[in-house]
Each structure stands twice: as structure tokens, then as C-alpha cells.
Amino acid sequence: MLEALTISQGLFPFLIIIFSIILHEVAHGYAAYVQGDQTAYRLGRLTLNPIPHIDIVGSVIVPFVAFFTAGTFFGWAKPVPYNPHNIRTKIGLAFVASAGILTNLLIAVVTGIVFKMLLVQGILSPELAKGMFTIIMVNVSLALFNLIPIPPFDGM
């Protein structure tokens, strides 16, 4: 029973991490598209379908090994490609670079607002509160982690 509990408790955070990383990467591609670069669009990477974004090592093997050995998740998705030469301005380049981080922060803020609204109305169950807290923590963690100023993170 303990093993099943651990696996079920790990599945929700894993799915949230995968979904949040995909939104993060699609945000980069969409920002590049808005700035004039169609690379991600032409390669079919402006999609929420997880298949084109999954890196077998970073999205499957490493997260599962990390969870079953350390009880935590670590992983990555394929970066959405863009051609910086197609971006019109330096501000456009900054917009593309920051789009993923801003997306993760937006997810966290919107989830926090919904959390507060449900709490005030008295309809927030402990299970829902824990799930929403997980969404907030995953996305804030991804945003902060991507601020690290070393390649391949967004902070570069």
C-alpha cells in the first residue's frame, strides 16, 4: 500500500511538471513566432501535444530514476527551436528569452488567485489545496531554476 501511495503521489507532480515545461517551451516558440520567426511553427513545435517536446532521457528516464531514488523529480524537454536572426529587435530577443519564465509565473499567479477565491468561499478541500499548492510550487521552481545564468537555462 505504501508503494502505491508513493506512486500515486508522484504521478500528479510528474504530470504538472511535464505540462508546465511544455507550456514553458511553447511560450518561447510562440514569442519567437510573434517576433517574426517561424522556425518552431514550421517544425510543428507550437503545440501542447507532449510528444514533439519529449526528450526520452530528460522527460522520462531521468524523472523516474530521480523519483524512485530520491523522491523528487528532475528533468527537461526538448527546447523549442528558434532562429535569433529572424527576430526583429533586441527587445524581441529578450521577449523570447523571458517568455517561458513569465509563463511559469503566470500559471503560479493564476493558480494562486483561484486558490484564494476558493479559500474565501470555503469550498477548498484539503486535496484540492494540496494539488493547487503543487502547481504553484512547480511553476515558481521552474521559473527560478530557469533564471540560472548558465547554458542552456533562460538566464543566459
What are these regions (language model features)?
Residues 1-156:
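Hydrophobic transmembrane alpha-helices and their immediate loop junctions
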